[in-house]
Amino acid sequence: KYREASTYYVASIDYATGKYNNALVEFTRLKDLPDYKERSLYYITQIYFIQNKYEKVISEGKELLASYPDSENNSEVYRIMGNAYYHLGNEDQAINMLSKYVSSTDSPLRGDLYILGVCYYNKGNYSSAVNALGRTVRENDALSQNAYLYLGQSYLKLKDKNNARMAFEAAATSSFDKQVKEAAMYNYALLIHETAFMGFGESVTIFE
């Protein structure tokens, strides 16, 4: 018992100090022991995520969720598994996991809401995309600029041109990403031309 507790203590210190390979070895030794299985699996899943080993994230995460369906750590497991699925190109499972994550916390991370919104958009679920992306744009940064561009596209798909115009305008007036800015400006200009709504000056100047 003392040896197991000592191994867990050393593994936790290694994890906290960024010695992830050492921590992984130590937690792997402990993960088949009932007293340490849940905590060890959780740390192992986190380490694989930090190391971008997404297939292993999913494998360990599945075992953790199956063994401990009511764990208080499951919200974070949903989050990192959702990200792993997204990076592997499985947007259906990314939506499945990230939507569980968002439902399980009062303060979902903006980056995860953005990924969820993009996945919804790519799957043609534009109303859900608007909901997720709309919760992303709380700060003046590159993430919000990208989210506004996707919001504009989502509103266009929903035939809500007024909200689309405002979203494109928000992305176009931000300068964090030049390509996003130009794409937003182009879409904003098209909408102004189409709806004869004047902002930013006359529509003819927008196209210049």
Predicted regions and their residues:
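Acidic, polar-rich low-complexity tracts and alpha-helical solenoid repeat scaffolds
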Residues: 1-208
